[in-house]
């Protein structure tokens, strides 16, 4: 027969009322060690019957991760590794927009001359701001 022990449980006496008085309960070693196998055969059989009735199978079911396989037979870890390798080189080869880069001065440009009443102004394309850039500058100021 399993040895009986006195176990102290600290409980609450209600919502917000914390009671620190220990409540002595007699519990066997098998009842307190849920993960270890029981030395008492009747107690072990009782635990297996409870597990079988809860899960609908014989004893404890296999782990969920052990059952996760694709149709081709690969496991969850192999799928994660394959996805990780595919994502590694994806960001390297992507084309990124040219944001926050200084304007590049082109050496081959044509100078446009705009004539107003009384004077002529040269316009170099490498120094002209685009419309979207000028709108962005107006909003930030």
Curated annotation (Swiss-Prot):
UniProt keywords, alphabetically: Nodulation, Plasmid
Lineage: superkingdom: Bacteria
Function: Responsible for the nodulation efficiency and competitive ability of strain GR4 on alfalfa roots.
Family indicated by similarity: To the N-terminal of nitrogenase iron protein (NifH). Has lost the ATP-binding site.
Name the UniProt record assigns to this protein: Protein nfe1
Gene name for this UniProt entry: nfe1
